[in-house]
Amino acid sequence: LEPLADLILADRTVDPMAAAENFINAEKGVADAASALTGARDILAERISLDPGLRETLREFMSTRGELVSKWVELGGDQPADADAQSAKFKDYFEFREALSKIPSHRVLAVLRGRREGVLAVSVELTPDEELQSPHPAESLIAKHYGIERTGRLADDWLLSVCRWAWRVKLRLSIETDLLEEIRERAEETAIGVFGENLRDLLLAAP
């Protein structure tokens, strides 16, 4: 189905559903045009997700505009007797968000510790208003990267839906994982630096 994906991407005037009719092949598991388009979508989404230039653009965008978000995960089932006390340590982060570009290292480490202990669900998001935008700003960046826009051509809407699928299914979690690892490393380096400075001051002050 790669030829179908390439055809639609190269010629936006093509009707995707009509083009897909030519790729129906029951023996290969492509029962109808919709199945052919699903396969073509997956091929393009995978290609998009592996584009290093695009990934860097999205990573930089989410790093600059994104917020670290944490929410309380309600504990269920049999829990240790001190489970509530353990959760209470992270109460300041039960409903929390702060810009990645501004959040201090100690808060980053606290949030990530809460996630490790199963108390907090953690994500990287844009502002609530931006997250509700349709298309999502990240989807718009993907579309812009490939010169895809709604101009009335037959393939425009289908290609925009591929951008949406690529972000939601292929790229979002991957970019989020990269950013969480990046801020964790930065926060740990800062914490080590602060500890070293404090230890130095303590040793210099010793009689």
Which residues fall in each region the model found?
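Duplex nucleic acid-engaging cores and interfaces of nucleic-acid transaction enzymes
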Residues: 1-206
